Amino acid sequence: MFLKDFSFELPEDLIAVKPVFPRDSSKLLILKSLNSYQNCLFSDICDYLLPGDLLVVNNTRVNASKIIGLKKTTKSKIEFTFISNEKNGIWLCFALPGKKVSIGNLFVFKDVEGKVINKDKEKIYIDFGTKNNEFTSILKSFGEITLPPYISKLRKFEDQDNEDYQTIYAQKRG
């Protein structure tokens, strides 16, 4: 199997850039066998579940972890996606454009400053030190959900995306 096996043309007008409402009116593809499938709605799912079947649901909340940082020396805007608070205020993140980020750079996120202490290929580590709690609050208040590239090229982030990109079972931060 090759990556090119998954490449195909998908017209933009077939890409859903917003979820359907109500949510259970979304499409559901039922695969009956290798050569037999049926299109239906998610609200019909109970018609296809049998006793003993296992239905797995995702109860993880999508983190709003994308935020713009200003490079302290040049004031250039860099888009950061924060993945995890590794330890003692040191965060693992990715940046676009990553090539403009170097070890030792200082970035300001709203009014909290962080220093790049390590960079390994795409991974970047920023130390917020004693300002970690303040940064965490800023990320919760101003962070955005990262939209998939096929959507972000068609439209900008909207506040409603913070709810629309959560499953109805979302409880735990993930």
Regions found by a protein language model. Name each.
Residues 1-174:
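A cross-family signal for N-terminal binding/gating loops and helix N-caps
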